[in-house]
From Swiss-Prot:
Protein name: Ribosomal RNA large subunit methyltransferase K/L
Taxonomic lineage: Bacteria, Pseudomonadati, Pseudomonadota, Gammaproteobacteria, Alteromonadales
Cited PANTHER family: RIBOSOMAL RNA LARGE SUBUNIT METHYLTRANSFERASE K/L (PTHR47313), RIBOSOMAL RNA LARGE SUBUNIT METHYLTRANSFERASE K_L (PTHR47313:SF1)
The protein's Enzyme Commission number: 2.1.1.173, 2.1.1.264
Gene Ontology CC annotations of this record: cytoplasm
SMART domains: THUMP (SM00981)
GO MF terms, alphabetically ordered: 23S rRNA (guanine(2445)-N(2))-methyltransferase activity; RNA binding; rRNA (guanine-N7-)-methyltransferase activity
Pfam families per record: Methyltrans_SAM, RlmL_1st, THUMP, UPF0020
Catalysed conversion reaction: guanosine(2445) in 23S rRNA + S-adenosyl-L-methionine = N(2)-methylguanosine(2445) in 23S rRNA + S-adenosyl-L-homocysteine + H(+); guanosine(2069) in 23S rRNA + S-adenosyl-L-methionine = N(2)-methylguanosine(2069) in 23S rRNA + S-adenosyl-L-homocysteine + H(+)
Organism per entry: Shewanella baltica (strain OS195)
Protein localization: Cytoplasm
UniProt-listed PROSITE patterns: THUMP (PS51165), UPF0020 (PS01261)
Gene3D superfamilies: 3.30.2130.30, RNA methyltransferase domain (HRMD) like (3.30.750.80), Vaccinia Virus protein VP39 (3.40.50.150)
Purpose: Specifically methylates the guanine in position 2445 (m2G2445) and the guanine in position 2069 (m7G2069) of 23S rRNA.
Amino acid sequence: MLNFFAAAPKGFEYSLAQELTEFGATEVKESVAGVYFTASLALAYRITLWTRLASRIVLVIYKGSCESAEQLYNAAYCVDWPAHFSNKSTFSIDFHGTGGFLNNTQFGALKIKDAIVDRFRDDDIERPNVSRVDAEFKVDAHFRNGVITIAMNFSGPSLHQRGYRSTTGEAPLKENLAANMLVRSGWQASPSTLLDPFCGSGTVLIEAALMAADIAPGLQRSRFGFEHWRRHDKAVWQEIVEEAKARASLGVKRCEIKFYGSDIDSRLVALAKRNAENAGVLELIEFKVADALTIAPPAESGYLITNPPYGERLGNVSELLQLYYQLGDKFKKEFGGWKVAMLCSDIELVSSLKLKADKQMKMFNGALECAFNIYTLHANSTRRDTPVLPDGVDIADIAPAFANRIKKNAKLLEKWAKKEGIDSYRIYDADIPEYNVAVDKYLDYVIIQEYMAPATIPEAVTKRRLSDVLLALPSAIGINPNKMIMKTRERQKGTSQYQKLDERKLELITTEYGAKFKLNLTGYLDTGLFLDHRLTRRLVGQKSKGRRVLNLFSYTGSASVHAALGGAKSVTTVDMSNTYIAWAKDNFALNGLQGKQYEFVQSDCMQWIRDCNEQYDLIFIDPPTFSNSKRMEDSFDVQRDHVNLLASLVKLLSPTGELVFSNNKRKFKMDIETLTKMNINVTNIDDVTLPMDYKRNPHIHNTWLITHA
């Protein structure tokens, strides 16, 4: 009898142990990411050909304690390597594990390589060559807790590679993971009609058809690790292969199970058909292009086993939440008598099904931890009695307090926005503390920004509430889910407002009191326009006629545009970011503003103020709450530094000039006493700069008008 280890993804151990036991293996023992077992050579061949779950089978050649580099070398040297492989075969060592004397896997591999080469030489045999790529004989070594295990890769390339897959879709599912889904769902034990409405490249259905038709998953593999093993028995192996071929031919003819697969992507359906044809099971599976939400049950009962899209895989989160909710509704109403088994990594999406799982287990899709949930759907079951809205989501069922509040806000603010001449505004700002989000409308898009929840609230609770928000929004305000954009921000985190998110651009043009501005809804945490400063920008425009205007920390220059449109004699726009200076220039061009009177300066604003010798009639400054950019000489804290900042700016003001100063620090306290002693007048103008859509959050910013005394 020989000792083996069958490796598999984490979470497969129980299923794999059961499979090996059914094959007839003995001394079956589960371990981390695999199972140890004992088998004859013939049984090992059979397991390698027929296992649907293992990723790799290795033959254990040596196992013992190891406490030094010398002991590691000796352990490898004592193996009779010339009896295992020819010196004409190339070899490689795959070493895993560190600890104690061994802190480098390359060193471990090198010691074993030296021992193998020396063993050949000491037996008066020319040494074999090492090949880093595609070696013919592969040694697997594992070092853990002072024990070294040296093995031969018996199976060869990963066993999940059956040989039928031509190419993959965007989010391929490994074949042995699909097989484990079929095993753990209970389908393999009692096969019946099987449906996969998100079939992708067909992996779940093909693996199921291979099971039902008694086809060995390894039949189409062209290479096995034991082929260059000197103790390989070709006759025994060939007998096992021929038996499997005969069973496959008979199994396809006898198979009476019905398989149905569909996907909304016609390209993937075509790929699934090619893969099924390669696997020899195309005649058993009915594929079609269809939306999962329109699929009717193909039988009175059966299994629906699928790997639907989720966050790490495909799709937009708000669209996916809607999809899962509607799937749950469809399953309840139309699939009574069926079992549903779904693989998903996102707990929010799973909970959006609104179904109670019979079983919940963990599986790993590569490195991604997923939930595999199994549901039993009872006949004539409905989720609720209240009517479902056209988009499939009933407001009464999802976050009713939030849905009703934002619906009311949206209706009121839409009329107001039309009168104001704006098309971008806030419709919700954590009005209800449990739903701690801000929702901004930009033309026909909305951006949902989740505030950081207090540490006292469990993460599962905040995730549940957020998914409820995303589910309720489309019906509540009449928005298409694919025009919902989700962002996360923390309150008062310095320059986080300028953080770049990704390279994608979703650009729109918004209108504000006659001015036009370019928005980027996806590239950055903010969009290019701070909506809460809308009235402040208009105020700057109203005060600009015939005046020399300076805009510091200008961001995308929106206040500068209002100043120019307001008739400013000149406008100087200063920001440290080249990106935002370029954006400001785009905004000027968008409004037909050009000329030498409009100056754009990329500079550290604090240093620019110190170096400036010009006079201005109107200055607008909206500095960050805190900044320690590498491009600035010193850090800046608006509370700590505002007196010195304002004193420096007043020096740049003409005798009748005005300074509009604003910031977003929620607990900001203006040092009026010190500024008054410096002959500086300070007047709070929050009441005239807070827009209607921000009345629910009066501390969003504070604004001050400053002049010479």
